[in-house]
């Protein structure tokens, strides 16, 4: 309530607003219900008895004006609920008799397993939400005024006391009649005098029995199926029904089976549109999944959404997600066609291929261990991202390029066999995320027996990866990238074989891969690089590519002079900042250290460029 809004007074209508009802109970306010069941005005409003609620609203204002009771009328925004099935009909809360289930007992039996991590939530942040809700549990209204549903199993007996209801709860009318005749005064009651409650049970009251009723565990307790399948391992659901369904299944599990219904609960994110709104039928903001599948493919849609769906985090949907999934599908198809298109011959395995096979085997084992760790912690999106990068970057961009034979040349059998084994393993790892393309390609990767499917193909135990070899390959990528940058900057054709100078020598077991992917003639170990060479650093190691005979010297001098002028200007700005005593004294230590590093880097770069210019001008 805001003291400066409207009258500054609070209107409380306990019979017509859920919040007001709670407030009325707290302060013992009178409950006045002005509506009849047919939405006409009740006898509580004598002037308008029998009038439709909407018509009544139209005449009340003129009546108040005529009585001189309106000081002024102001427009303001209000939230009015409308029927989902008839958008022109406003919905009004109304008091009526409801059935409730006492919940304290159920909360007491469902709290410990989550508190003690016997039943785990993924992500764990929902554990506190669950605990707080159960600790402040309210009784559950289990009746609904619906045409369809499981009917409330209550039968009312006739009575002259309007303040007191007499009823029995029974499985059917025969049982109800039997129970009713045991009540004093109703010994001769007939079945026709019983009135079956017209309300239906809340949908969730049926759903909370799902893990049990699915295997007939209520009517046939201890049967073979319920003993085998209960409790199950994992439940996948949305966080917005953690109270409606998850908590209540746990309650029912302990109540009827004496055990939790599952060991883990994985909460997916809520899919929202670009504006952050939850997708719903009423908003019409949900794309047609069949149209998405037709446009991007089933695996494309599935994989794109999985990549964007960290556990428990909402997804801001965009078609670009599915497009990314489709592009990845295309990448897999193209890699498959490339590999299956190679001609195989009994030729010697090139050294670059041998090194590439050795490296990728360890890279695959490293990724396999990471994926298994993500799966064990229910980080499915992270697992998908590891596989996405493994296939797109490591396998396609680096491994296949390292082993690809020269144009018109065959592939050696050892490398081809290893490549097919790697492809097989990649398809197995990707299968849970992309079932259709992986099944299709796996069937064509090798000869298969009838009925054989990738669904039954096992993922082997991971072997500890050689981290030193993986680090060596990381250096290879930087060295190859450095040489490619030199080619681009100096406009050197890809066909031209270059020499790479490694100052202090190259200590890398994957040297043959560098030579092949960088298009090198050789790698020379030198104590001092050629001053006219294009240099670059990989960590603390210095490399250089001699280019004197391959470039336009005058153009290179102009470019170096321009770069030198810019770097000197940059150094001057850094010096100015470091010469400011107030900056050095007051700025965070890390910021000052970063500026000093910029100064040192600029000075080193200037010295290198001056040296190169001097060599070019000779």
Where are these regions (language model features)?
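C-terminal low-complexity, glycine/proline- and small-hydrophobic-enriched intrinsically disordered tails
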Residues: 445-618
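Alpha-helical recognition segments enriched in aromatics with Gly/Pro capping
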Residues: 1-3, 27-39, 146-149, 153-159, ...
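NTP-handling and nucleic-acid-processing catalytic cores
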Residues: 1-36, 109-143, 147, 181-182, ...
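Structured, non-catalytic alpha/beta "coupling" segments that mediate domain-domain communication
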Residues: 69-103, 322-345, 436-444, 508-542
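Residue patterns forming the tRNA-binding/recognition surfaces of aminoacyl-tRNA synthetases
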Residues: 2-161, 241, 277, 283-284, ...
